[in-house]
Amino acid sequence: MMNKVKSSGIKKKDKKLWGLELAMILLAAIWFIPIYYLIVTTFKSPQEATASPLGIPKTWIFENYSNAWKQMSFPRAFGNTVFITATAVILIIVFGSMAGYALARTKTKLGNRMFLLFLAGLIVPFQMNIVSLYKIVKSLHLMNSAFAVILVNVAINTPQAIFLFKEFIEATIPMELEEAADIDGCGVLKKFFRVILPLLKPVISTVVIIVTLNVWNEFLTPLLFLQSRENGVILQEVSRNIGQFSTDWTALFPMLMLGVAPLMVFYIFMQKYIIGGVTTGAVKG
């Protein structure tokens, strides 16, 4: 009798596992099919892309990539994108870590209200304030400047960085380390840069990855503030090749791959730090 109960329980578990595996396969297919379609289309002629959208190319046309490279001025657009992204990431790391440390160690009503104010930046979409941002950038004479996009992206992404740094510091860094630094005569800045900052490497890695993905994929702010093609980013070059009535997908998709490939490589090599950084500060104690 007991054996029958055990066997029926095992069968139920097997059915659940099969159901979960089937769901995972379906989710993987939903994710993979568009990527597959994007990749194979980059090597097709326009006629073949229309006749056989998901088929393997009969003739692999590698010239599509060289044409896209020239048409979108990829080195210039790539350089602009890297400059904007790297500068924004550095500024967010500096400001976010210092603000997160200050809020983590300031146990006052004012500190709590400031933290709630920063959290509001996570809740309210920046698109709601885009008109105000446009007027501010124009009044500062930063139109058509990469620094306009950098400053706006810093303002958009800093609240999330502050939240991650604050929670990580509270969860993992004991006050005894800072008290020992105080005894050794360290000031606030020296204590932060010598003691606290080296311990923030896991969460810094997480913030770097998240902010890089956000800034690299940001399209609205470059579209508004970078009007000349010389200062444009990769996504702007891609959008310029989308026609109002028709689009050559075999020319557009290689541009998309050129723009996405560096980000995919970066994410593949850095994704383990996301889990490590988030889980380290997830549980206090």
Model-derived regions, located:
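A structural signal for multi-pass alpha-helical bundles of membrane permease subunits
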Residues: 4, 9-12, 16-285
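Charged, structured surface patches that assemble and position nucleic-acid processing machinery
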Residues: 1
